[in-house]
UniProtKB/Swiss-Prot annotation:
Gene3D superfamilies: Adenylosuccinate Synthetase, subunit A, domain 1, Adenylosuccinate Synthetase, subunit A, domain 2, Adenylosuccinate Synthetase, subunit A, domain 3. GTP binds at residues 11-17, 39-41, 307, 333-335, 415-417. PANTHER family: ADENYLOSUCCINATE SYNTHETASE (PTHR11846:SF0). This is Adenylosuccinate synthetase. GO terms for cellular component: cytoplasm.
Length: 430
């Protein structure tokens, strides 16, 4: 059976830390979608490991790790990330596998990503992408003109010529749209000829890989990237990523049936953050937002961009819960709220004086909503040294209980600091 870790807000919730905790007891960790536009930081002892494309389970020496079919892979970044982990002492090369069906991100995808974003900026409609080429790669995938891993590593005598043909076709179509690129596309092609041999040992048939693990009753953890509110279908479109970031993306990105899913863990930051453009109803453009940003050290792992900050939005989380069906929650960074005398929580939206029954799909409406807040008392106590859930201040427990009652989902873990062991587990009834 598979357990799944998913982001429930706009990303940066701290999914990697829960994955790291759960990886102590699993056999396989799999990424199902996204690319190196995601970012996790995991702290083991005094060492920080940054993950963008590769599964966080690599920190566990007994865990096999799969980059699934739904992931889009920039090969130079794949090897750079692997080398960075190895430099920090992780011996993980023989535990990393890549789906033969995953699509490849090329440098021209990244160039077109930035060029398109620049065009949109002129009309003040920029998405705020990471510029990693993720969107353009999913676009070529959807138009059936993309290049997959198996096209690169195939040992068929005609495979390399076919790869070159596909590559030039993609490059030329982008040149027609954007003009000449500011780099040598033939040099990139030559690099990929070398990558053929380097990448081949990692490549597997991920369908066979996953179903063999399931038949053998291996304990499998699926690591979602980004978060539900960035989902291509259910997020705040068009200010979203280009993949399915919810539970549906797990099934399509790994090729597994729904009946194999056991627990679905929703990771929730104790307040709300967002990187890039797009609506953010509970955003605080004031001293509260600045305090959350400063205390929480809210900078993106992938881009280094300052994150926008605001109060917890339970309307967003209810919507997220309806789609993903969380079985329990991990509330992260609760300690960031330690110094607040009062804490506000968004519990409803009003538009033109009328309460909305659901999260609006129309961004014009969403931009005009008035958030209804519930004010809860803070605990004004340092919780970073606390080791058990029972030791939490009563007001902190009340804050967590309020979230549970609103969503109808139990809180199972509470993050109280950046360290690997700064996570309290709360017993829940199944």
């Amino acid at each position: 059976m598979c357990d799944v870790v998913l982001g429930s807000q706009w990303g940066d919730e701290g999914k990697g830390k829960l994955v790291d905790l759960l990886c102590d007891d699993i056999d396989v960790c799999a990424r199902c979608q996204g690319g190196n536009n995601a970012g996790h930081t995991i702290v083991v002892g005094d060492v920080k490991y940054d993950f963008h494309m590769l599964p966080s389970g690599l920190v566990n020496p007994n865990c096999l790790n799969l980059v699934g079919s739904g992931v889009v892979v920039h090969v130079p970044s794949f090897f750079q990330e692997l080398e960075n982990l190895e430099k920090k002492g992780l011996n993980c090369r023989d535990r990393l596998f890549l789906s033969s069906r995953a699509h490849l991100v090329f440098d021209f995808h990244q160039r077109t990503d930035k060029l398109k974003e620049a065009e949109l900026s002129e009309n003040k409609k920029a998405i705020g992408t990471t510029g990693k080429g993720i969107g353009p790669t999913y676009s070529t995938k959807a138009s059936r003109s993309g290049i997959r891993v198996h096209h690169l590593v195939s040992e068929d005598p005609e495979a390399w010529e076919e790869f070159k043909t596909r590559y030039h076709r993609l490059v030329n179509s982008r040149k027609q749209r954007y003009g000449e690129f500011d780099y040598d596309v033939e040099e990139e092609l030559a690099r990929y000829e070398k990558y053929r041999e380097l990448l081949r040992p990692f490549v597997v048939d991920s369908i066979e890989f996953m179903h063999t693990a399931l038949v053998q009753n291996k304990r499998i953890l699926v690591e979602g990237a980004n978060a539900l509110m960035l989902d291509i279908d259910f997020g705040t479109y068009p200010y979203v990523t280009s993949s399915s970031t919810g539970i549906g993306g797990v099934l399509t990105g790994l090729g597994i049936p729904p009946k194999t899913i056991n627990n679905i863990y929703g990771v929730v930051k104790a307040y709300t953050t967002r990187v890039g453009e797009g609506p953010f109803p509970t955003e605080q453009l004031n001293e509260f937002g600045e305090a959350l940003q400063t205390i929480g050290a809210e900078y993106g792992v992938t881009t280094g961009r300052k994150r926008r900050c605001g109060w917890l939005d339970l309307v967003v989380l209810k919507y997220s819960t309806l789609i993903n069906g969380y079985t329990s929650l991990n509330i992260t960074k609760l300690d960031v709220l330690d110094s607040f005398k009062e804490i506000q929580v968004g519990v409803g939206y009003k538009l033109n004086g009328k309460s909305l029954a659901s999260f609006p799909e129309d961004l014009i409406k969403l931009g005009k909503v008035e958030v209804e807040y519930k004010t809860l008392p803070g605990w004004e106590t340092d919780i970073t040294k606390i080791k058990t859930y029972d030791e939490l201040p009563e007001n902190a427990k009340s804050y967590l209980k309020f979230i549970e009652d609103y969503l109808g989902v139990p809180v199972q873990w509470v993050g109280t600091g950046p360290a690997r062991d700064s996570m309290l587990e709360k017993p829940i009834s199944k």
